[in-house]
């Protein structure tokens, strides 16, 4: 896996985590 792919996956995981937190707070 390339470095760019790893960074994209990390960014997506962070965004999904943030969305999950937002849904929990509502």
Swiss-Prot record:
Which keywords does UniProt give here? Cytoplasm, Fatty acid biosynthesis, Fatty acid metabolism, Lipid biosynthesis, Lipid metabolism, Phosphopantetheine
Q: Where is the Carrier domain?
A: 2-26
Q: What does this protein do?
A: Carrier of the growing fatty acid chain in fatty acid biosynthesis.
Give the UniProt record's GO annotations in the biological process aspect.
Answer: fatty acid biosynthetic process
PTM section of the record? 4'-phosphopantetheine is transferred from CoA to a specific serine of apo-ACP by AcpS. This modification is essential for activity because fatty acids are bound in thioester linkage to the sulfhydryl of the prosthetic group.
* Protein family: Belongs to the acyl carrier protein (ACP) family.
The coding gene here is: acpP
Q: What is its main location?
A: cytoplasm
Q: What cellular component terms from Gene Ontology apply here?
A: cytoplasm
Q: Which residues cross the membrane?
A: none
Q: What is the lineage of its organism?
A: Bacteria, Pseudomonadati, Pseudomonadota, Gammaproteobacteria, Moraxellales
Q: Which organism is it from?
A: Acinetobacter calcoaceticus
InterPro entries attached to this UniProt entry = PP-bd_ACP (IPR009081)
Q: Please give the name of this protein.
A: Acyl carrier protein
> Its annotated pathway?
Lipid metabolism; fatty acid biosynthesis
């Amino acid at each position: 896996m390339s470095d760019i792919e790893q960074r994209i996956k990390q960014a997506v995981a962070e965004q999904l985590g943030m969305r999950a937190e937002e849904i929990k707070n509502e």
